[in-house]
Amino acid sequence: KINKGTALWNKDKKEIKTLKNVTINEPFFLGHFPDKPIMPGVLILESMAQSACLIILDLIENPENHLVYLSKVNNFRIYSNVIPGDQIIINAKIVHEKLNSFKFESTCHVNDKLVAKAEFLASVIKR
């Protein structure tokens, strides 16, 4: 999960910057990997998707009556490992929207170094 209360939201540009503090207490570190803990790539992607969902939920009316789901991931790349003690800065921006679908570009940085990037589609449906 991204950390609460750490989002910088620019509604005009439809972009957000969020923060994820990576601690050794994360349960996934028990098995990934016991002697060399590395944050799983799928969880880096999940933090990017959560950040993007915050944008969508702020843009739609009655967000409590909707679900946002990830419908496609393109060009997901990991450039560097994320380890306990790292602080991930996640940037997500809407680059295209049509009806109930949103295309995002997202990057993750640790200490100003690019560690991951992806493009993805998210869709909104009523509950």
Regions found by a protein language model. Name each.
Residues 88-96, 106-107, 117:
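Acidic and generally charged, gly/proline-rich low-complexity regions
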Residues 52-89, 115-117, 123:
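Hydrophobic beta-strand-centered segment that forms part of the acyl-chain substrate-binding groove
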Residues 1-38, 64-67, 79-83, 95-101, ...:
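Non-catalytic linker/capping segments at the edges of enzyme domains
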